[in-house]
């Protein structure tokens, strides 16, 4: 165990410094040894690894989660005698519901008439948290494929969307994934609790019902191209920059090359073209908006967006899901990618470093204010 002696102001404890140095050396040796061993295991594992599934679908019944929280709170809050009556009533209702369902199946029809025909509506919840490259597409496409393999127009899909936008092609693909749901005539609700801007709104406007929280950021229907240019810096220091290309507009804006007015005009033309396509996309899917008034690149909060017909309702995703649990079977669907040993090792090391830094920072702060 490392003992930290109490030092008087200005006192230098050589013994403490030596002990602390030895501690760091031992700790560093152990960490390096562990990393080497795990790296060898990882490399060996990768060599012997057989191709298989990239990941798997996980489905969580949200009704159970809400019922569990409700029951826990009931037991703490309600009188015991009253609670017994509540449970008795619920058991009776559940029994009556099962009996009615059984009778409906008997009335009828052949054994092939499965409970599917008399089942409750199913409500599938997906999550999309986008970055500049919309990397969450990798999971979204798998989740949608899984849902479409079982859902039908009686069901509904709710997507909790959070994205400030990003690259046009990436968000175009993400939007196309949502179109798969609409093409199957399955109702699509999109909930925005925080932000759906630019490419995020490109996705959101596809919803049959678009719901936003009061202060969610909505809009930014615009296109931007920006990059720094160091051509003047290179000239100042007599550094040549060579670029060979074929095609008049193969390179219009570059980081190190000199930008010509012709190149600048071409980029502006491309930006205007993409903006026009973006506007047409929004107008096609939300015909009630005044597209020229909202496609200015501006952002509005949820309540302002509703006034401009950019969203349909002001609510949170929690409200939508809780309401759905009253009348439907609600499932949160998530595609989980398998993590390699390298990924797991990286996360462990990152977590360890964060904890060590946090502890050091806390101790430093405590010492400062003692």
Identify the function of each model-found stretch.
Residues 200:
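DNA breakage-rejoining catalytic core of tyrosine-based enzymes
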Residues 4-189, 195-196, 209-213, 224-370:
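N-terminal organellar transit peptides
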Residues 203-209:
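Alpha-helix C-terminal capping segments
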């Amino acid at each position: 165990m490392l003992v930290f002696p109490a030092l008087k102001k200005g006192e230098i404890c050589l013994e403490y410094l030596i002990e602390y140095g030895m501690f760091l050396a031992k700790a560093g040796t152990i960490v390096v040894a562990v990393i080497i061993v795990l790296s060898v295991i990882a490399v060996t594992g990768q060599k012997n690894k057989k191709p298989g599934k990239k990941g798997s679908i996980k489905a969580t019944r949200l009704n159970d989660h809400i019922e569990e929280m409700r029951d826990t709170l009931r037991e703490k809050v309600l009188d015991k005698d009253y609670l017994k009556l509540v449970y008795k009533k619920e058991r009776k209702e559940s029994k009556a519901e099962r009996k009615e369902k059984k009778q409906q199946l008997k009335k009828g029809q052949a054994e092939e008439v499965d409970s599917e025909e008399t089942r409750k509506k199913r409500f599938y919840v997906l999550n999309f948290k986008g970055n500049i490259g919309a990397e969450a597409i990798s999971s979204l496409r798998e989740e949608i494929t899984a849902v479409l393999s079982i859902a039908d127009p009686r069901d509904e899909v709710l997507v909790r969307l959070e994205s400030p936008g990003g690259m046009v092609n990436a968000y175009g693909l993400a939007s196309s994934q949502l179109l798969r749901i609409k093409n199957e005539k399955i109702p699509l609700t999109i909930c925005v609790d925080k932000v759906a801007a630019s490419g995020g709104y490109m996705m959101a406007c596809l919803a049959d019902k678009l719901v936003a929280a009061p202060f969610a950021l909505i809009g930014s229907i615009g296109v931007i191209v920006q990059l720094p240019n160091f051509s003047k810096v290179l000239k100042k220091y007599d550094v040549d920059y060579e670029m060979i290309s074929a095609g008049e507009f193969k390179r219009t804006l570059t980081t190190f090359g000199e930008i010509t007015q012709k190149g600048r005009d071409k980029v502006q033309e491309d930006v205007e073209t993409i903006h026009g396509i973006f506007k047409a996309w929004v107008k096609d899917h939300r015909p009630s908006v005044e597209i020229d008034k909202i496609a200015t690149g501006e952002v509005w909060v949820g309540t302002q967006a509703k006034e401009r017909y950019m969203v349909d309702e002001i609510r949170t995703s929690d409200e939508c899901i809780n309401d759905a649990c009253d009348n439907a079977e609600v499932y949160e669907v998530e595609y989980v990618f398998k993590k390699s040993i390298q990924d797991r090792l990286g996360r462990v090391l990152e977590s360890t470093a964060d904890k060590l830094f946090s502890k050091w920072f806390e101790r430093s702060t405590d010492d400062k204010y003692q």
